[in-house]
């Protein structure tokens, strides 16, 4: 749903998504790597809303992912990187944020969150416990650089009749 001026509006619409995906995958002996790039343009269309067309809530224009893994006998290590442009959101009008009891928003999805970036690492060791039982032990670190990735942002009016910002963040270390 919407977290802006259309939050409580019931309307039927559609969306169009166009884009390109590229994948490069290469294996070198014990190392396997891949790299992807995606470009996407996702746009909503609602005949009875103004404006009638605006970016989709998940309109992430550019996305890059890279991963590589190394295997040697019973040992495996992997690393990955994920980056993408920020998704759209709607800010209140800076000069006049509240009209009556409602937030006065800018055009829908006209702002973008900061870019998202994450680096992950993992290691795993496989070993036999007996002739019939195999075991694995491993560890992984998600968001190794502990980036402060904001994945959503919305607004509410607090008890003091001020606009309050809420941010949803991805996991850190």
Where are the predicted features?
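Generic detector of contiguous secondary-structure segments
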Residues: 63-69, 103-106, 128
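A subset of signal/propeptide-processing and intrinsically disordered low-complexity segments
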Residues: 16, 36, 115, 138-141
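Residues that define the transmembrane beta-barrel architecture of outer-membrane proteins
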Residues: 14-18, 60-64, 115-119, 133, ...
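Gram-negative outer-membrane beta-barrel transporters
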Residues: 2-92
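C-terminal beta-signal and adjacent terminal beta-strands/loops
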Residues: 83-99, 117-118, 124-173
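Extracytoplasmic loops and strand-loop junctions of Gram-negative outer membrane beta-barrel proteins
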Residues: 2-9, 46-51, 101-109, 157-162
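Short, glycine/charged-rich beta-strand-loop motifs at protein surfaces that mediate ligand recognition
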Residues: 106-113, 124
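Surface-exposed coil/turn segments at beta-strand junctions on protein surfaces, enriched
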Residues: 26, 59, 70, 112-114, ...
């Amino acid at each position: 749903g919407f977290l802006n001026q259309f939050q409580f509006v019931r309307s039927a619409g559609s969306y169009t998504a166009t884009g390109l995906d590229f994948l490069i995958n290469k294996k070198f002996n014990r190392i396997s790597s891949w790299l992807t790039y995606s470009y996407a343009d996702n746009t909503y269309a609602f005949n009875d809303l103004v404006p009638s067309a605006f970016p989709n809530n998940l309109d992430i224009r550019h996305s890059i992912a890279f991963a590589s893994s190394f295997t040697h006998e019973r040992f495996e290590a992997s690393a990955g990187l994920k980056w993408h442009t920020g998704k759209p959101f709607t800010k209140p009008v800076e000069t006049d944020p509240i009209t009556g009891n409602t937030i006065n928003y800018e055009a829908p999805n006209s702002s973008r969150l900061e870019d998202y970036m994450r680096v992950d690492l993992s290691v795993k060791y496989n070993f036999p416990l007996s002739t019939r039982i195999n075991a694995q032990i491993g560890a992984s670190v998600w968001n190794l650089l502990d980036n402060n990735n904001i994945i959503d942002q919305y607004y509410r009016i607090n008890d003091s009749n001020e606009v309050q910002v809420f941010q949803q963040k991805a996991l850190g270390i």
